[in-house]
Amino acid sequence: MATSLRITGLVKEYRAGKPVLNGIDLDIAGQGLTAIIGPSGTGKSTLLRCINRLIEPTSGEIVLKDAEGTVDLARVRGQSLRRARRRIGMVFQEYNLVERLTVMENLLTGRLGYTSALNAWMRRFDPADIERAFQLLDTVGLAGFADQRADALSGGQRQRVGIARALMQRPQLLLADEPTSSLDPKTSVEIMELLTEQGSVNGIPVLVNIHDVELARRYANRIVGMSGGHVVYDGDGKGLDATMLKTIYGGESWLE
């Protein structure tokens, strides 16, 4: 069953009367990479964090439907929320690795949602999970790095670990919050290629918040442009002409 995500009337206010997200409506269905672009402060990261319930939406619906069932992520609580979040992989801008742990240990944290508190505390993991972790390290180009500490890795290597950790969850939906913002151009391309490839291989939608319009054009089959907490564009890269980019970002100096 293909994964679908339906967002309806999503609002997020950090201060009353000043919404960061102002009535977002968005449907994501089937595999493929969707890029979210827009200026800083327009709510791109807030949107992804609402989907994964790292922050609480103020109002609206976030309905995830996949092989495990249908759940409104905006309303679910407690153990039901814990189970729902297992279905969503998240790749973070600043990697969000445990620096003192090895690469292998960081990957295995992606299975904590499936592991008892005692086994997690004792660092006891299923042999099948360990085997999968080694396979994923090979997939992301880090074979042989299992025993290296995370703080010994380059930025690109850390992001690859972050992607592998997200895939350890066997997610039905993969979110990536500015995954290339701290990387050089060559590594940024490699990370986008990896996200696109893994979305296709695993048959899941990938939703990427990205600041680089050209990378979005190159890899996304769908681009969502946000401005002022609203969706102002939803289409492919061909529709992102100078007029539309001005609508999304405001001004023209950045186009020169």
Curated annotation (Swiss-Prot):
Q: How does it sit in the membrane?
A: Peripheral membrane protein
Query: Where, subcellularly, is it found?
Result: Cell inner membrane
Q: Gene Ontology cellular component?
A: plasma membrane
Q: Which CDD domains match?
A: ABC_PhnC_transporter
Q: Which GO terms describe its molecular function?
A: ABC-type phosphonate transporter activity; ATP binding; ATP hydrolysis activity
What keywords appear on the UniProt entry? ATP-binding, Cell inner membrane, Cell membrane, Membrane, Nucleotide-binding, Phosphonate transport, Translocase, Transport
Q: What class of enzyme is it?
A: translocase
Which family does the entry's similarity section mention?
A: Belongs to the ABC transporter superfamily. Phosphonates importer (TC 3.A.1.9.1) family.
Q: What does this protein do?
A: Part of the ABC transporter complex PhnCDE involved in phosphonates import. Responsible for energy coupling to the transport system.
Subunit info here reads:
The complex is composed of two ATP-binding proteins (PhnC), two transmembrane proteins (PhnE) and a solute-binding protein (PhnD).
Q: PANTHER family recorded for this chain?
A: AMINO ACID IMPORT ATP-BINDING PROTEIN, PHOSPHONATES IMPORT ATP-BINDING PROTEIN PHNC
The protein depicted here goes by the name Phosphonates import ATP-binding protein PhnC
